[in-house]
Amino acid sequence: LIQKLDYINDGDPETSSDLGCNGIWLMPVMPSPSYHKYDVTDYYAIDPEYGTMEDFETLITECDKRGIKVIIDLVINHSSSEHPWFKEACSYLAALGDEEPSLEECPYVDFYNFSKEQLDGYSQVPGSDVWYYEARFYYGMPDFNLYNEQLREEIADIVDFWFAKGVGGFRLDAVKEYVSNDHPASTQILTWFTQMVKEKKPDAYLVAEAWTDISAYSGYYDSGIDSMFNFGFADSEGIIANVVKGNKQASEYSRSLEEIQDLFGAHNPGYIDAPFYTNHDMGRGAGYYAGEYSPAQTKMAGALNLLMTGSAFVYYGEELGMKGSGKDENK
């Protein structure tokens, strides 16, 4: 990535050989047992597959020279089941049996959501036939209890650590799952996080993911967060693709832009839209079209994404018409 920075932005406004991007979003870079790294085992380190902390610091330095801000994925909805906090809590509960846990003996028990009932979305604690834990995505991603004050202090410390490393902000994963099936509660937690971050660094940029419909994710702007990814325009059935395919009139694009300005602005007058056309969870944009006009359609779709207000995001390779679909690793 460091070697390709001049392709992203060479820092010279007089040249035209770079993309001219002023920000980079890094998907999870922290140690994790998975290929996608959304299940973190250490929030204070760099996964060896990507390099070292020294490499990261060099990246920040070189980006600063070019006027590029770096934001990183911060996954606080859940950790890896291999995280020391979770492993210690599970070991404690397995030894405890049917007795009630003591937070003085093991405070990490309250970092997660444990129960003696196998509730929906819960998996069995290893080594125990009594205890279960919430893991909505899958058993290897135990959900945090984001109401726990000690955990919140840990998250604040993590934010401090990465600000000290020079990051300009964070992308927040799966915010609608902070409290699953409870939009007001998830918004409340997002409000806490946003306020905490802005007190530390007022110019920090925060963008969050809530993969749902526009009427639902617009409500998260009540938290005061800068941006929510604008899913309504993205993917193969989004507004952009449907206009480019001819399934919708071009006027639908402009009308929708006017509508979201009113909708988002009603929740947060200072919002910054975060349009994107495709991402790591979707097929590549170049695969949305077929036939002799597909290259032109791909270019037009990319242009419509960049024409939107706010901070447009471009998934790497989209500027080249890169293809890929199916498994996440192929995207």
Residue ranges and their predicted role:
Residues 1-8, 155, 159, 260:
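Generic hydrophobic alpha-helical segments
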Residues 1-150, 164, 175-223, 231, ...:
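Acidic/aromatic-lined carbohydrate-recognition and catalytic surfaces
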Residues 20, 37, 51, 166-169, ...:
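Glycine-centered flexibility sites
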Residues 76-78, 140, 156-181, 270-282:
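Active-site groove signature of glycoside hydrolases
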Residues 82, 87-89, 94-116, 194-195, ...:
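Conserved alpha/beta catalytic core and glycan-binding cleft of carbohydrate-active enzymes
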